[in-house]
Regions:
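Transmembrane helical core of 7TM receptor-like proteins
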Residues: 1-334
Length: 334
């Protein structure tokens, strides 16, 4: 079907998102579980954003990029989870035509931005480890700002094309989407006519946005690993690998789940698999990322304690413990 000669007909005013069909009591359980997951995601990522903003020791490109990535995670998870929570308590589970495509646009734009941000963070680690002497001269404030703007805007600009094309398909009958988000694949399946051009453009966008950033990250870390292996000191090697380990874990979680969704062959239950994989990279991964980034990072853990107001209490407890130990030692001597 030729796109230019196509007549757009929208008799469908809303869609039905089936989500996870189950007994009403299970729907309440799902609501509780995902409410907790969403709250923890917001708290964890907001804590990182505040830590980077308030702690001057974290005003370096690596942590500034991490703070922006955490803010991006908040936006990313907010495009889907609030509507999913509302559907757990709703009997109609409907979403308007405009809201559905708005969710599609923002969800995939933020997801695309995450891929680009992971590339930028890999590039920053490459410069810091492979070009340490030139790092301050290359990673200037202007370059860092430009990379941040690029990371936020690129997905929104590039995903306009597939969203507009899919929204212009004729929808004149079925309106039930067996998913918890407005995913483009079931949306195209609901169209009254098959448009191979739109499907090809969407598939091309997916391939470019998944494989391109992933290959860039692999190449960056291949060079990083070679540079680390040439380091003479074992302590330097451990520090370099520790710095990159958290970022690599996030890359594997995000790109691994996305590629399972869009690259791997279909299973016996493709629809259910799609839901679970989408749930993993849209809800579980943003929940785990704050823990991954702060688990082995002393500077981040110290800054997070300040944000949570626990550092002062920890210091007081340590001082009291030292005081009691010194008193006990003195009494034993006397």
């Amino acid at each position: 079907m030729n796109v230019s000669s196509r007549e757009t007909t929208h008799t469908v005013s809303h869609f039905i998102l089936l989500g996870f069909p189950s007994h009403p009591r299970m729907q309440l359980l799902y609501f509780g579980l995902f409410s907790v997951a969403y709250t923890l995601t917001l708290m964890g990522n907001t804590a990182i954003v505040c830590a980077v903003r308030w702690d001057r020791r974290l005003h370096t490109p690596m942590y500034i990029l991490l703070g922006n990535f955490s803010l991006l995670e908040i936006c990313y998870v907010t495009t889907t989870v609030p509507n999913m929570l509302a559907n757990f308590l709703s009997t109609s589970k409907s979403i308007s035509f405009v809201s559905c495509f708005a969710q599609f646009y923002f969800f995939f734009s933020f997801g695309c931005d995450e891929g680009f941000y992971l590339c930028i963070m890999a590039f920053d680690r490459y410069l810091a480890i492979c070009r340490p002497l030139h790092y301050p001269r290359i990673m200037t404030k202007q370059l860092c700002t430009g990379l941040i703007v690029f990371g936020w805007s690129c997905g929104f600009i590039l995903f306009l094309t597939p969203v507009i094309l899919i929204s212009q398909l004729p929808y004149c009958g079925p309106n039930v989407i067996n998913h918890f988000v407005c995913d483009p694949v079931p949306l195209m399946m609901l169209s009254c006519s098959e448009d191979t051009t739109t499907q090809f453009i969407y598939s091309t966008f997916n391939a470019v946005f998944m494989i391109g950033p992933f290959l860039f990250i692999l190449c960056s870390y291949a060079l990083v690993i070679l540079a680390v292996l040439r380091m003479p000191s074992a302590a330097s090697k451990r520090k370099a690998f520790s710095t990159c380990a958290s970022h690599l874990a996030v890359v594997i979680l995000f790109f691994g789940s996305v590629m399972v969704m869009y690259v791997s062959p279909g299973s016996e239950h493709p629809v259910e698999m799609q839901k679970l994989v989408t749930l993993f990279y849209s809800v579980i991964t943003p929940l785990c990322n704050p823990l991954i980034y702060s688990l082995r990072n002393k500077e981040m853990k110290t800054a997070l304690r300040k944000v949570c107001g626990t550092e002062g209490r920890v210091n007081k407890i340590q001082m009291r413990a030292k005081f009691h130990i010194s008193n006990a030692t003195y009494l034993n001597k006397t």
